[in-house]
């Protein structure tokens, strides 16, 4: 996931596309523009941590990725959490599954969402974000701006 965040920060589309199972380049320009625009507000990412659980089949996993967004002009990092499903590629690397989510996978993520560890991680991330925004008005304003 560090490679993912670095590719986003650098607008490195070659690396970014290779991180996904589809390797689809049709939206490459759209993502490049989005990442360039984000660079105005986001200076980077830090403290990337992956919490994984086995997937539905061998060579697959679900991951909850904790990371902190570094907004430009804001001192306090913004705690964040994202969920992904990854599949091991033929070369042994992991790729983010960007295909249409099957009913089976949807059900699997629903089951994971009630797992005590997943619920705790989500709660801790939300609480950390709330505390960070309470402590830093600039962060609160930036987060609200980015939601628009």
Annotate each predicted stretch with a short phrase.
Residues 79-96:
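A short, surface-exposed beta-strand/turn
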Residues 14-67, 73-78:
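Short solvent-exposed beta->alpha transition segments
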Residues 96-148:
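Low-complexity, intrinsically disordered terminal/linker segments enriched in charged
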Residues 8-9, 35, 45, 49, ...:
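Generic alpha-helical secondary structure signal
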Residues 33-35, 80-82, 112-116:
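Short, charged/polar low-complexity linear motifs in solvent-exposed/disordered segments
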Residues 1-15, 135, 142:
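Short, aromatic-enriched amphipathic alpha-helices that serve as compact interaction elements
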Residues 72-76, 95, 105:
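Intrinsically disordered, low-complexity acidic/polar segments
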Residues 5-9, 21-25, 71, 91:
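Sec-exported extracytoplasmic/periplasmic mature domains
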């Amino acid at each position: 996931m560090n490679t993912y965040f670095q590719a986003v920060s650098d607008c490195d589309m070659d690396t970014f596309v290779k991180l996904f199972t589809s390797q689809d380049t049709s939206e490459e320009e759209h993502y490049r523009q989005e990442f360039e625009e984000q660079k105005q507000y986001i200076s980077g990412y830090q403290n990337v941590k992956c919490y994984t659980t086995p997937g539905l089949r061998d060579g697959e996993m679900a991951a909850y990725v904790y990371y902190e967004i570094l907004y430009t002009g804001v001192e306090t990092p913004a705690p964040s959490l994202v969920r992904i499903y990854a599949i091991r590629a033929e070369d042994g690397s992991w790729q983010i599954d960007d295909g249409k989510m099957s009913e089976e996978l949807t059900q699997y993520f629903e089951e994971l969402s009630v797992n005590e560890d997943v619920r705790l991680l989500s709660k801790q991330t939300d609480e950390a974000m709330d505390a960070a925004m309470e402590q830093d008005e600039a962060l609160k304003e930036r987060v609200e701006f980015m939601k628009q």
